[in-house]
Amino acid sequence: MFRIVNGEDYSPAVQQRNILDFGKAPSLLWTDNGSSNDRCDTGGNGRESGQDRVKRPMNAFIVWSRDQRRKVALENPQMQNSEISKRLGYDWKMLTEAEKQPFFEEAQRLRAMHRDKYPGYKYRPRRKPKRPQKLLPADSSVLCSRMHIEETLYPFTYKDGCAKATRSRMESQLSNSQPTNISSSLLPQEHPSSWTILRHNRVTQATQTCGRPLLL
């Protein structure tokens, strides 16, 4: 059931009433007739119709594959649509130029008709929405930044602490798995810190100068 909307319905009062009654009234859809400015009420669910979007003119392959796709689908009902497309693409490549020529001519005729019907048409492909990048949890980012700062400010302390923690963890694992005595030479050795190296150098210099070590 269609209702023609005349020019008086474009008054501000009528437009305001249409906005208020938008949730109750059926959705409004422009007709596809380019020579008419009327609108018609439909029983749609308010979603945008595909009739507003102008389709591209068919190329030679699409013209050829229309009947071929239907034929392959009837002969192979279990075949997926993606497999049918691959098969049609292979069959199209196997055709000779003479066999393809009628479909190129038909595509050219359809393109001319499309150009006359839609003179200002421009192909605008639909862009896929960008997927949001995965972000690290707040705790992980804070922990990573804190470890980076500590390693930058205290390089020797940070490395010594990591070495001690690794050594203690390996000792506990080895003691639980193998109760026998294991030589300490097999375990990773601790690297001396900067303070230990500095202290050893001072003791060595004092011994060479005075003949006996100085107590620090």
Curated annotation (Swiss-Prot):
It holds the Pfam family HMG_box. It is found in: Nucleus speckle; Cytoplasm; Nucleus. GO terms for cellular component: cytoplasm; nuclear speck; nucleus. The keyword Repressor applies. Residues 54-122 bind DNA. Keywords: Activator, Calmodulin-binding, Cytoplasm, Differentiation, DNA-binding, Nucleus, Repressor, Sexual differentiation, Transcription, Transcription regulation. Residues 31-52 are annotated as: Disordered. Its main location: nucleus. One of its GO terms (molecular function) is RNA polymerase II cis-regulatory region sequence-specific DNA binding. One of its GO terms (biological process) is male sex determination. Coiled coil: none annotated. Belongs to the SRY family. Transcriptional regulator that controls a genetic switch in male development. It is necessary and sufficient for initiating male sex determination by directing the development of supporting cell precursors (pre-Sertoli cells) as Sertoli rather than granulosa cells. Involved in different aspects of gene regulation including promoter activation or repression. Binds to the DNA consensus sequence 5'-[AT]AACAA[AT]-3'. SRY HMG box recognizes DNA by partial intercalation in the minor groove and promotes DNA bending. Also involved in pre-mRNA splicing. Interacts with CALM, EP300, HDAC3, KPNB1, ZNF208 isoform KRAB-O, PARP1, SLC9A3R2 and WT1. The interaction with EP300 modulates its DNA-binding activity. The interaction with KPNB1 is sensitive to dissociation by Ran in the GTP-bound form. Interaction with PARP1 impaired its DNA-binding activity. This is Sex-determining region Y protein.
